[in-house]
C-alpha cells in the first residue's frame, strides 16, 4: 500500500530551473554539480631526462584517467538533462521498489528525487498545493537546511532566511549574473529552486 501511495504521486519538471541548469551546462566552466566541458590538457614530454620523462608520463596517465571520468560524467549529465527536457511538459510517475531493509527507492536510475543536487532541483510535484499557515516558515527552514544549517534550532534557521532577504531577491532576479549567493549553499541548485519558490 505504501509503495502504491508513493507511486501515485505525479511529478513534473521545474522548467525555469531546468533552463538555468542548461544555460550553466552550455557555458561550461565550474558550475556546481556539472562537470567541465573541457578535458585536461595532456602534453608530451620534450626533454631528455629519463626521471622527468617518467614523472611526466605518470602525470599524463592521471590526466587521462581524469579525462575519462569527465567524459563519463558529461555523458551522465547529458542523459539526465535530455530526460528532463523530454518530460518538461508532462506529469509522470515513479515506480518504486523496496530493498531488504524496507527502504523504498524509485526504479528509474538516471533522473529521480533521490539523485544529485541537479536532479532534485529540476523535479517538483506536478500538483502544487498552497503553503498553508506555516508553509512559508518551513520553506525558509528548508532553505537554511540546504545551506548546511540543519543542526541549528528551527528559529535560527528561520532567522537565517529572514536575514538574507536581499540575497534571496538578488538570486531570484538574476541567478546567473547577480551576486550568486545561492552558490554558497551545500546543495546550490536545490537552494536556487527554493529561492525561486520564495521569490
For the regions a language model picked out, list residue spans one by one:
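Non-catalytic nucleic-acid-binding interfaces of large nucleic-acid enzymes and RNP effectors
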Residues: 1-199
Amino acid at each position: 500500500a505504501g509503495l502504491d501511495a508513493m507511486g501515485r504521486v505525479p511529478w513534473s519538471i521545474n522548467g525555469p530551473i531546468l533552463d538555468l541548469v542548461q544555460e550553466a551546462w552550455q557555458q561550461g566552466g565550474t558550475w556546481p554539480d556539472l562537470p567541465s566541458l573541457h578535458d585536461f590538457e595532456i602534453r608530451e614530454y620534450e626533454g631528455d631526462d629519463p626521471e622527468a620523462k617518467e614523472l611526466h608520463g605518470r602525470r599524463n596517465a592521471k590526466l587521462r584517467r581524469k579525462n575519462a571520468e569527465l567524459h563519463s560524467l558529461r555523458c551522465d549529465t547529458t542523459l539526465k538533462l535530455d530526460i528532463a527536457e523530454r518530460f518538461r511538459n508532462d506529469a509522470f510517475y515513479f515506480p518504486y521498489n523496496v530493498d531488504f531493509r524496507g527502504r523504498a527507492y524509485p526504479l528509474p536510475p538516471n533522473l529521480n528525487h533521490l539523485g544529485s543536487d541537479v536532479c532534485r532541483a529540476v523535479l517538483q510535484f506536478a500538483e502544487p498545493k498552497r503553503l498553508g499557515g506555516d508553509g512559508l516558515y518551513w520553506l525558509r527552514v528548508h532553505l537554511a537546511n540546504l545551506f548546511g544549517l540543519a543542526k541549528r534550532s528551527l528559529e535560527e534557521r528561520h532567522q537565517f532566511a529572514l536575514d538574507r532577504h536581499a540575497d534571496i531577491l538578488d538570486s531570484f532576479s538574476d541567478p546567473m549574473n547577480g551576486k550568486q549567493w545561492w552558490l554558497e549553499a551545500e546543495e546550490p541548485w536545490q537552494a536556487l529552486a527554493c529561492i525561486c519558490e520564495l521569490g
